[in-house]
Swiss-Prot record:
Cellular component per GO, a single term: plasma membrane
Compartments where found: Cell membrane
The species this protein was found in: Bacillus subtilis (strain 168)
Keyword field contains Transmembrane helix: yes
Occurrences of domain ABC transmembrane type-1 (ranges): 89-300
Main location: membrane
Keywords assigned: Cell membrane, Membrane, Transmembrane, Transmembrane helix, Transport
InterPro entries: MetI-like, MetI-like_sf, Phosphate_PstC, Phosphate_Transport_Permease
Protein name: Probable ABC transporter permease protein YqgH
Family: Belongs to the binding-protein-dependent transport system permease family. CysTW subfamily.
Membrane-spanning ranges: 30-50, 88-108, 133-153, 165-185, 214-234, 280-300
Lineage summary: Bacteria, Bacillati, Bacillota, Bacilli, Bacillales
Entry keyword Transmembrane helix: yes
CDD domains: TM_PBP2 (cd06261)
Any one GO molecular-function label of the UniProt entry: phosphate transmembrane transporter activity
């Protein structure tokens, strides 16, 4: 009888333990599913809200979409208001592309140095620096650019201050450099050792191995890092606003002042009446930013699919 009771007790404990594990699994699934649904709902709600607000200037206020995207005139407070945002679209693309042209070579070169040239101590030295740069707030970058970079650039201009497209480009290139470097370093470190060993076995030097074997193998991921950096640069507002000048005209040179979509939105949104034409056109500019973010995401997914192939 005692053995039977002990066997029943053991079996009951096993059943109870199994039921508890099943309950824990169900709870875990429910929590994860709820979090995923909240994220999806928030993303959909933001997209719908921004889409509805962004389209009101065209559907309700009668602003021409063609004029909005192609006109060079932005003067919403004039007696004959103009709502052309082409200078700001150009400024956003210009500062993004130029900053990527500066940060991409430096970031990829830094990643190669960390993983291939000095793998033992390079990462120990550079990784904390990269993490420090990532953690610095945008306003600090902007303040340093305003107090150091802008006066320096002003020395090379015949008139005016040093606020310019060049200042915004340099500040943004420093801001996106950690993103490009860290992702590129992970890409280089994830390459199989057989690539390096096979190249060395064929008599290639370290530089030949890096240039002709490793970089081509990691190229899709390296481009993903660059695109992620560009996506951050395109959406940055505060740091750029402090140094770029925020003018309404197309810049003719890197030393000219400029404006971007994000800087104009942050400068003007608080000074407009909710629901007014100017307010709705600012929401339309936000919709343009959202569309560009989707395009960056699609480009990243395309590059990621190439990497898997």
């Amino acid at each position: 009888m005692i053995n039977n009771r002990e066997n029943m007790s053991v079996s009951e404990r096993l059943i109870s333990s199994r039921q508890n594990r099943q309950l824990d699994e169900v709870r875990g699934r429910m929590i994860v599913t709820a979090c995923a649904l909240i994220m999806i709902a928030a993303s959909v709600a933001i997209t719908i809200f921004l889409g509805v607000k962004g389209l009101q200037s065209f559907l309700v206020n009668g602003v021409s979409p063609i004029e909005f995207l192609t006109s060079l005139n932005w003067n919403p407070t004039d007696s004959d208001p103009k709502y052309g945002v082409l200078p700001f679209i150009f400024g956003s693309f210009a500062v993004t592309i130029l900053s990527a042209l500066i940060a991409a070579p430096l970031g990829i070169a830094g990643a190669i140095f960390m993983t291939e040239i000095a793998p033992n101590w390079g990462k120990k030295v550079l990784q904390p620096v990269i993490e420090l740069l990532v953690g610095i707030p945008s306003v600090v970058y902007g303040f340093i650019g305003l107090t150091v970079l802008v006066p320096f650039i002003a020395q090379f201009k015949s008139s005016g201050t040093g606020h310019s497209l060049l200042a915004g480009t340099i500040v943004l290139s420093v801001m996106i450099l950690p993103t490009i470097t860290s992702i590129s370093a992970d890409a280089m470190a994830s390459l199989p050792k057989s690539l390096r060993e096979g190249s060395y076995a064929l008599g290639a030097t370290r530089w030949q191995t890096i240039r002709k074997v490793l970089v081509p193998a990691a190229f899709p991921t390296l481009m993903t890092a660059v695109v992620l950096g560009m996506a951050r640069a395109f959406g940055e507002a505060l740091a750029v606003q402090m140094v770029i000048g925020n003018t309404r005209v197309l810049p003719e040179s890197p030393f000219d002042t400029a404006g971007t979509l994000t800087t104009i939105i942050t400068l003007n949104m608080g000074h407009t009446t909710y629901g007014s034409v100017e307010n709705n056109t600012l929401w339309s500019m936000g919709l343009v930013l959202l569309v560009m973010s989707f395009l960056f995401i699609l480009l990243i997914r395309y590059l990621s699919s190439r990497r898997k192939v």
